[in-house]
Every structure is written in C-alpha cells, then in structure tokens.
C-alpha cells in the first residue's frame, strides 16, 4: 500500500461497507450517468442490461463505490431536468444495480426530494456538488437518514463574487459547508470534501456552479490540483473528480475521448497529496495506476 503522510482528522468515513480515510487505501468511485445530457457519452448507461454490465465490469476492475447521476450539473451545458424525471432515471438505474450487486451507491444530486424518493433502494451516500447550500432541506435529510455526504465547494451567493476560486477560497467554501452540516447535527465522520473541479466559472447555464472573477476555470482547476494538500487542514477525507474534465481539453486541445492520460496523472498526483477518493470514468486504468504507485513507493 502507498503510505501517505499521516493526516490527523476526526474519523474515517464509512460509505456502505467501504472506509474512506486519508491514510488508508485509496478508494475508487466509478461514474454511471443515466442522463443523456452528460458530457462524456461513454459514461451514459440507460438500459438495464447496460447498467448491469457496467457494474460487473467496474467490480472486476476494482471499483469500491459507484456514483449514479440522473442530471448533468456541468456549468457549460443546458442540462436542467425536472426533479421527477431525475428521480425516475435514478430509480430505474439503482433498481437495476440492486438486482445484481450490493456495492455502495452514492447518488449525485442536489435535490433532497430526489434522495427521499430513492431511500427504499438502499442508497449509501449523497454527492451534493453544492455542499448542502442549494437545497435547504438536504442537511436535515442527510442527518435523518444517517447518510454520508460528499460536500462540493460552492459559492451560493452570486452577489458576493470570489476573486479566483483559488485554494484559499475553496477551503473557505468547504468550511462553510462543514458548518452547515454540523448545524444540522451531521457527524464529522459522515463528511467528505470535494474541491469541485470544473465548477468555478465566469458564466454558466445552471445554478450549480460558482461564479468567479479573475483566472479562467482551467487555470483555477490546475491551481487546485497543485495545492490539493492544503485541503487536508479541514481534517476530512478528500474526493476529487478530475476524469476527462474540460480543463484538460482546454489545456491540451483534446476531445473528451482523448483525455485519459492527463486524467490519470492528475489523479495520482492527488493521491500523493492527500486525496482519499477518486471519482472516475476510468476504473481499470485508475486502479492500475494506484497499484503501480504502491509498488514504486
């Protein structure tokens, strides 16, 4: 195992039966999108057999958790859908998964009503890109259901623009989300933080991005990855979602299908600097890269 520098924090976080900790095994979260609007078309699985085949493949490739999304929140796309449609998509997908697997499932949504509609399907975590700030009912629901939450860095007040969304800004926004969670009595060991790569923009088409001034988003994203270790001061496990993101395309002029190698390099840099959970489209390649790092180090 790659021995990370020991980071003192409150407690490990359990998602289903999987522990997520800064100084333990790096965990892999595989992405399944059931929203046809999502930016990476190879991640879109809508039919039951497609979803089940993907789960089997991911498990064979070494996935720990799957993150299922029913609505794209990419800032640069017009992808908002009604919550009933999002719920229906997710219900069908998670039902298909539960027919064949007990793998821990995280639900990628900002809507508490969507989570509530899925509770009978045994979901294991909430992945909220707005860090409990968009839907005011989400914190209480997470507490009520004792669900771990991945808190995305998010600036909810569009009138109070941050200069760049740099690592200091990002840390402050995540600290705000931690305080919101604590106010709703969500235990610290239920929280994972995510710096929201790709979500800090000057302009966007939905309410789920953070509006900033100053540096362009792709410069900001590289700055966050370069300084990711500073987020360990928040004493929470860190999740990053770098896989095939648009900053890689902007930096290298690459289409989404050609962004694998830069994605893997950035992910491994994150692991070497305190990241505990990698949310990725590329489970097999990410697992191989982590194992190689463990052999070398």
PLM features: what roles do these ranges have?
Residues 1-39, 297:
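N-terminal amphipathic alpha-helix/helix-capping segment at the start of soluble metabolic enzymes
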